[in-house]
């Protein structure tokens, strides 16, 4: 089968595209004929040598996937050959990833694809959608009528947070760096959009939410705790999902006096059961046209190395090249 893979960690140049043996289906696994995958920052960190866990050699990267079941192990009873499925949490914890024509995946990580969606959409929404849902509803416990600030409303996770928060009736404040992204945030449902290149973000948040925001979702790899604590309401909740190596200053005094709380989480540590709860809502919202995948561009799988370069330019070099996900067609 054709696959994107690497044998040693390093720059995107270590990624090869070629033939690898087809995967063997385990007893409680399925073989998915992959239709589309998407690129996430963690894919680039692993490829660059982040020492999270030992990697198989060769290693196929990729967390997200959408495609069709073509084979099943004898213990799989709740799925069927020919069924369209989507999911994430691959290429992690030592598991092989999805950037290949075929992927052997434990059945517990699979979710049925909604009717009238395509593989490109479901691959684009997988990790970022599950991440947003976990943070909003299992950690921040966002309620209808509350106010949330999320940085970067057109980003992969940010765009999901905006849409999901609006879906339950929250007030959404977000940021955008140019008029095009401002318009996209408005289209996604944001109530207040702050141009961080032209305005003082802290002052604009105070104008939009005089009593503070109930939830502050930080997407930066270097969290701005001064901004967050100043912007939060009494008993405000801060969500952290990035910044593994960050060690920024922290304003302890106002944080505890307000009775705030901080919730950090890594999506890939959520159980399959927790992720199924997320997937159920995602499927419902996709079917109801409430939630839409945000795709910046679609490339062939053979251009995985270039996709990694683009992702790194956006994530690490902060070039704001992307407005949505990079999807690879298989």
Give the role of each language-model region.
Residues 21-38, 50-91:
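Glycine-rich beta-strand-centered segment in the early N-terminal region that forms part
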Residues 84, 147, 171, 236-237, ...:
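Short glycine-centered segments of the SAM/dcSAM-binding site in methyltransferase folds
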Residues 223-292, 329-330:
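Glycine-rich phosphate-binding loop and adjacent beta-alpha segment
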Residues 122-198:
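Mid-domain Rossmann-like dinucleotide-binding core that forms the NAD(H)/NADP(H) cofactor-binding site
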Residues 78, 88-152:
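NAD(P)H dinucleotide-binding glycine-rich loop of Rossmann-like/cofactor-binding domains
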Residues 200-210:
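Short amphipathic alpha-helix with an adjacent loop that forms part of the alpha/beta core around
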Residues 86, 149, 214-217, 239:
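N-terminal Rossmann-like NAD(P) cofactor-binding module of classical short-chain dehydrogenase/reductase
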Residues 273-330:
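C-terminal hydrophobic helical "lid"/dimerization subdomain
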């Amino acid at each position: 089968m054709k696959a994107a893979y690497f044998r040693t960690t390093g720059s995107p140049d270590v990624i090869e595209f070629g033939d690898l043996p087809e995967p063997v289906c385990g007893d409680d696994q399925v073989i998915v004929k992959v239709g589309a995958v998407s690129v996430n920052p963690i894919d680039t960190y692993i490829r660059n040598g982040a020492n999270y866990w030992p990697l198989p050699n060769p290693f196929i990267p990729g967390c997200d996937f959408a495609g069709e079941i073509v084979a099943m192990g004898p213990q799989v009873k709740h799925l069927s050959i020919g069924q369209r499925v989507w999911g994430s949490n691959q290429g992690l914890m030592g598991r092989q990833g999805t950037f290949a024509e075929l992927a052997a995946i434990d059945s517990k990580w699979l979710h049925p694809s909604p009717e009238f969606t395509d593989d490109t959409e479901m691959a684009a929404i997988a990790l970022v959608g599950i991440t947003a849902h976990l943070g909003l509803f299992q950690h921040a416990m966002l309620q209808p009528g509350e106010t949330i600030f999320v940085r970067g409303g057109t980003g992969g996770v940010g765009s999901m947070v905006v849409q999901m928060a609006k879906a339950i009736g929250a007030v959404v404040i977000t940021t955008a760096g140019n008029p095009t992204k401002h318009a996209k945030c408005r289209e996604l449902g944001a109530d207040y959009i702050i141009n961080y290149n032209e305005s003082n973000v802290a002052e604009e948040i105070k104008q939009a939410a005089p009593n503070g925001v109930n939830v502050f979702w930080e997407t930066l790899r270097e969290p701005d705790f001064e901004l967050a604590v100043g912007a939060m309401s009494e008993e405000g909740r801060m969500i952290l999902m990035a910044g593994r190596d960050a060690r920024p200053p922290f304003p302890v005094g106002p944080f505890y006096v307000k009775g705030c709380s901080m919730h950090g989480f890594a999506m890939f540590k959520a159980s399959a059961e927790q992720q199924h709860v997320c997937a159920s809502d995602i499927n419902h919202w996709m079917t109801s046209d409430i939630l839409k995948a945000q795709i910046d561009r679609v490339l062939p799988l053979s251009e995985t190395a270039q996709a990694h370069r683009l992702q790194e330019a956006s994530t690490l070099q902060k070039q704001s090249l992307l407005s949505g996900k990079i999807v690879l067609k298989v």
